[in-house]
From Swiss-Prot:
This is Protein transport protein Sec24A. Belongs to the SEC23/SEC24 family. SEC24 subfamily. GO terms for biological process: cholesterol homeostasis; COPII-coated vesicle cargo loading; endoplasmic reticulum to Golgi vesicle-mediated transport; intracellular protein transport; positive regulation of protein secretion; regulation of cholesterol transport. Residues 431-455 are annotated as: Zinc finger-like. COPII is composed of at least five proteins: the Sec23/24 complex, the Sec13/31 complex and Sar1. Interacts with TMED2. Interacts (as part of the Sec23/24 complex) with SEC22B; recruits SEC22B into COPII-coated vesicles for its transport from the endoplasmic reticulum to the Golgi. Interacts with STING1; promoting STING1 translocation to COPII vesicles in a STEEP1-dependent manner. Interacts with TMEM39A. Interacts with SACM1L; this interaction is reduced in the absence of TMEM39A. It comes from Homo sapiens (Human). Its main location: membrane. Residues 191-201, 209-221 have a biased composition (Pro residues). It is found in: Cytoplasmic vesicle, COPII-coated vesicle membrane; Endoplasmic reticulum membrane; Cytoplasm, Cytosol.
Length: 1093
């Protein structure tokens, strides 16, 4: 964003500061971005169906609860920063800098009262209904009219206006990164063992072909001549600005280079980009891709477009070489209905959930495959990286409203990949209108022209792009890696950078108060740092520093010329200053011995301290001042509630009411940590918080420092090196991953979509720097994001839509890189097709994000009611609009057969459960995880996997690196699946629980647990002995394999029948009734009663 006192690109300082959370002069409340959307829910009247009641039905169904609109607005973005929408304010010319560009102003959305498309929403559902005031509820489709932060305004996919914006690519490794603990996406078929040393991704260098070049060699590189007109004014370069970097430099018509001064301009294609001249003929063929084999007769149901895809008379382009022929992918390559595909029969089934019980598959649930031609689908993005809640996009907003399902994307953009194509080229080909990166779903009209699949502009193919470095053939632009891979990484040239890449900087901030010393965490952390010091991502420029604090702040001089570390104490916490800053952040290679000495002595330096106060706020201020010039990663370790100086907090939790549905302490008690996080984001500093506390520490307030700076939160309740050794093991394992995993610095991310679609709300840890540009001072491979979308214009003229995320970052090696993911989905016109393409896991994940926001802006009970109403609304819509005959029971499409189960699991998840057995910090941490975890981990935490493991066999096992990994079937989460003569393993994501029945076989007890009888099982038991038996080898291999697939370390608890941990085990039996929640069958009866009203 802009520096203090400097207006951001294209806007007045006041409005910008308001958006980013700075208090306005008028005294308006401090807010951080778009205001929470109203939960779009149209309570469409549902026809009175046959109210079928089964014997034994739940006698007192829950009445449907209508939420009251919530007045006012939250000053904060919620626990994770509410997913918010942001309307674009009119863009004012910069009064200081003369406008360098001109162009038509973007179309602004009308106020809710004037915009016929924006319908007010009732508070307890997702769908539009007339004559109701817009409450503070979830909203699928439309942005709200105010603004808050951590979730962004809508990013319209209108042909965005030039703004010549190419991502400034932060350079990342040419390799795909460090070996990952997680398995990469593997297509169906035999499992592929993970590589111990993943191969480096291929680097394509047009200037250095793999073999002898074709006759005559490749042509000389011709400089691109992008347009320079842009709607927004360009201020002077802001070299420390994080937001101003998603962009490309452009050549003016006379060939001179103009370096843009903001990320938004470099990356380009944002809301304020300028539309280019495009063909306005609505009948113009919007073909996608390049020549594909002809389809079977069943697919050829429409007339294909013309050979060129664009009427020559309407576009006066030179014909260019005519030898290149390409049949564009037209309507004959896409069926108009799901019935055209040879889907599995169950895809079209209607399921009565009250009669069919075993709907949970015995293998991990796979995402639905979009209804696309196989030649398009094989190029599509891996769903682990990029997936949509609806794999068939509704043609209109009205159709989406009628389906009453959320439309959104879930992303894991920086995931560790075994193979990642990396392109090194002086020319990065992008659409000159919307700045989309060329991708597999564009159309080549001929050898010299390609049509953008997002805004449909026809662009010229640069000369260099005609040469294919893989085949060493000239004249094959459609075979280049950029159009053969939906996920690709570009090495960005220097003109993509606003300032030279900064060195990797790692600053560690340790709490050394008496409480911290008692936990013994310093021993574990310092030892982990010593063990992994050489594995920190970076190069010869890597810098490191340390700060400790109690009631004072301690700095450590580590300059190479010193014989031992020098401790500098600052006792004035009211006005913190940095003593000898040049000695505090030092080159790791040059001062490694001093760093090692400090890490060895630090745990003993404060063993006799009696200081109980904690000045966390002043310590964070000092750390921020130290890191501001370069940016980097700040790792903060805290063990108690801050009690001294700025940011001091007071206990707010009442034990007897700590988890009630009307909890009022889920929002921050101060805006200090949020304001500081915004300052950190502006200087490219991300803050990761490690909270190791058995007492209430107000994570709702402390978590803001990570949420808005794109950091992460780690929570270790009741950490103690002697009393809770299993937490020590967990901290060490997770620190090893944290310290050695890949990292990107100075990152920004933008998501684009096809014209007609609009992105209006973002979820995750970041800060929205401009209307659709996410600022990520650090990006890590374990973070996930979500966005909500609406259909802004009818999609009747297109059969395919595309989504593209572009992540610009600097690698730890100092390379600027752009990682691009592109997803292509079909457009459908019938409600049945929308339901058939529903992705129930993605829908559940997006609803969980929305429910966290609702908890913050309204209340926990409102969030729970909205989750239930999401199921009622969608199944009511299916019953009334799709089913031809009203049958008794609870009829659902096969794609949504698990929707009620997953929503019930969310209601019983720690984030949203009622009762008083969850501490407030634990609930807040669970909500942090919902907002920051990739979908695969979120679903595992929400709906654990249950396996029977006392009879493991090699049948159907995976063979990975000489290991045999058993694959037992997944069981339903109900006690009726348990038996006292067996042993059952529950994988709940962050914890593994092995329940051993009282009558378990002697063979399992002796061959796996190493005990002679049931009573001999030690309590607590948190590890399995490695015995020389086949049974022991199988279960240890299986548990190790489960742990390897995630970036966090799940603790294993072996539970006897009378163990206190048994209650935790049974709490995760989602289908059974608990003291405060319905059983699955009772929940289905409640849903049925509401649907049949």
């Amino acid at each position: 964003m802009s520096q203090p006192g400097i207006p951001a690109s294209g806007g007045a300082p006041a409005s910008l500061q308001a958006q980013n959370g700075a208090a306005l002069a008028s005294g308006s409340p401090y807010t951080n971005g778009p205001v929470q959307n109203a939960l779009l829910s149209s309570q469409e009247s549902v026809s009175q169906g046959y109210n079928f009641q089964l014997p034994g039905s739940y006698p007192h169904p829950i009445p449907a609860k209508t939420l009251n609109p919530v007045s006012g607005q939250s000053n904060y973005g919620g626990s994770q920063g509410s997913g918010q929408t942001l309307n674009r304010p009119p863009v004012a010319s910069n009064p200081v800098t003369p406008s360098l560009h001109s162009g038509p102003a973007p179309r602004m959305p009308l106020p809710a009262s004037q915009n016929p498309a924006t319908t007010p929403m009732p508070s307890s559902s997702f769908l539009p209904e007339a004559n109701l005031p817009p409450p503070l509820n979830w909203q699928y489709n439309y942005p709200s009219t105010a603004s808050q932060t951590n979730h962004c305004p809508r990013a319209s996919s209108q042909p965005t206006v030039s703004g010549n914006t190419s991502l400034t690519t932060n350079h990342q490794y040419v390799s795909s990164g460090y070996p990952s603990l997680q398995n990469s996406f593997i297509k169906s078929g035999p499992s592929v063992p993970p590589l111990v040393n993943p191969p480096l991704p291929t680097t394509f260098q047009p200037g250095a072909p793999h073999g002898p070049p074709p006759a005559g060699g490749p042509p000389p590189v011709r400089a691109l001549t992008p347009l320079t007109s842009s709607y927004r004014d360009v201020p002077q370069p802001l070299f420390n600005s994080a937001v101003n970097q998603e962009g490309i430099t452009s050549n003016t018509n006379n060939g001179s280079m103009v370096v843009h001064s903001s990320y938004d301009e470099i990356e380009g294609g944002g809301l304020l980009a300028t539309p280019q001249l495009t063909n306005k003929n609505p009948k113009m063929s919007r073909s996608v891709g390049y020549s594909y084999p002809s389809l079977p007769p069943g697919y050829q149901n429409t007339t294909p477009p013309g050979a060129t895809g664009v009427p020559p008379s309407s576009l006066n382009y030179p014909s260019g070489p005519q030898a290149f022929t390409q049949t564009p992918l037209g309507a004959n390559h896409l069926t108009t209905s799901m019935s055209g595909l040879s889907l599995q029969p169950e895809g079209l089934r209607v399921v009565n959930l009250l009669q069919e019980r075993n709907m949970l598959p015995s293998t991990p649930l796979k995402p639905p495959v979009p209804n696309l031609h196989e030649d398009i689908q094989k190029l599509n993005c891996n769903p682990e990286l990029f997936r949509c809640t609806l794999t068939s996009i509704p043609q209109t907003q009205a159709l989406l409203n009628k389906a009453k399902l959320p439309l959104g994307l879930l992303l894991h953009p920086f995931k560790d990949l075994v193979q990642l194509p990396v392109v090194t080229s002086s020319t990065i080909v992008r659409c000159r209108s919307c700045r989309t990166y060329i991708n597999p779903f564009v159309s080549f009209l001929d050898q010299r022209r390609w049509k953008c699949n997002l805004c449909y502009r026809v662009n010229d193919v640069p000369e260099e792009f005609l040469y294919n470095p893989l085949t060493r053939v000239y004249g094959e632009p459609h075979r280049r890696p950029e159009v053969q891979n939906a996920t690709i990484e570009f090495m960005a040239p220097s003109e993509y950078m606003l300032r030279p890449p900064q060195p990797p900087v790692y600053l560690f901030v340790f709490d050394v108060s008496h409480n911290a010393v008692e936990t013994g965490y310093l021993n574990s952390v310092c030892q982990s740092l010593l063990d992994n010091l050489d594995l920190l991502p970076g190069n010869t420029r890597t810098k490191i520093g340390f700060i400790t604090f109690d009631s004072t702040i301690h700095f450590y001089g580590l300059q190479e010329s010193l014989s031992q570390p020098q401790m500098l104490i600052v006792s004035d916490i009211e006005d913190v200053f940095i003593p000898m800053p040049e000695n505090l952040l030092v080159n790791l290679n040059e001062s490694k011995e001093l760093v090692q000495d400090l890490l060895k002595t630090l745990p003993q330096m404060f063993t006799k301290t009696l200081e109980t106060q904690s000045a966390l706020g002043p310590a964070l201020q000092a750390a921020f001042k130290l890191m501001s010039p370069t940016g980097g990663r700040m790792s903060v370790f805290q063990t108690q509630l801050p009690t001294l100086g700025v940011g001091a907090l007071k206990p707010r939790e009442e034990p007897n009411h700590r988890s009630s549905a009307k909890d009022i302490h889920m929002t921050p008690s101060t805006d200090f940590y949020k304001k500081l996080a915004l300052d950190c984001s502006g200087q490219q500093v991300a803050v990761d918080l490690f909270l190791l506390s058995g007492q209430y520490s107000d994570l709702a307030s402390l978590g803001c420092i990570s949420r808005y700076s794109a950091g992460s939160v780690y929570y270790y309740p009741s950490y103690h090196h002697q009393h809770n050794p299993v937490q020590v093991q967990k901290l060490q394992k997770e620190l090893q991953r944290y310290l050695t995993r890949k990292i990107g610095f100075e990152a920004v991310m933008r998501i684009r979509c096809t014209k007609g679609l609009s992105i209006h709300t973002f979820h995750g840890n970041f800060f929205v720097r401009s209307t659709d540009l996410l600022s990520l001072p650090n990006v890590n491979p374990d973070a996930g994001y979500a966005v909500q979308m609406s259909v802004e214009e009818s999609l009747t003229d297109t059969q395919l839509v595309s989504f593209q995320s572009a992540l610009l970052y600097t690698s730890s090696k100092g390379e600027r890189r752009i990682r691009v993911h592109t997803l292509c989905l079909p457009v459908v016109s019938t409600l049945n097709d929308v339901f058939l393409g529903a992705d129930v896991q993605a829908i559940s994940g997006l609803l969980a994000n929305m429910a966290v926001d609702r908890s913050m802006t309204a209340s926990l009970s409102d969030a729970r009611d909205a989750l239930v109403n999401a199921v009622i609304d969608s199944l009511s819509a299916y019953r009334s609009s799709v089913l031809s005959n009203q049958q008794p029971g609870l009829m659902v499409p096969f794609s949504l057969r698990l929707f009620p189960l997953f929503v019930l699991a969310l209601l019983k998840q720690k984030s949203f459960q009622t009762g008083t057995n969850a501490r407030l910090d634990e609930r807040i941490f669970a909500m942090c995880q919902v907002k920051n975890q990739p979908l695969v981990y979120l679903m595992l935490t929400t709906h654990p996997s249950l396996y029977r493991v006392d009879n493991l066999s090699d049948e159907g096992a995976l063979n990975i690196s000489d290991r045999t990994i058993p694959q037992p079937p997944i069981l339903q989460l109900s006690v009726e699946k348990l038996s006292r003569d067996g042993a059952f393993l529950m994988d709940a994501g962050s914890v593994l629980m092995l329940w051993v029945g009282k009558n378990c076989t002697q063979n399992f007890l002796s061959q796996v647990l190493g005990v002679q009888n049931y009573a001999s099982i030690p309590q607590p038991m948190t590890d399995l002995p490695e015995l020389d038996t086949p049974e022991s080898a199988r279960i240890i291999a299986f548990i190790s394999w489960l742990r390897e697939q995630r970036p966090f370390f799940p603790i294993l608890y072996v539970i006897r029948d009378e163990s206190p941990m048994k209650a935790n085990f049974l709490q995760n039996m989602i289908e059974d009734r608990t003291e405060s929640a319905l059983s699955y069958y009772e929940f289905l009866l409640h849903i049925q009663q509401q649907v049949n009203k």
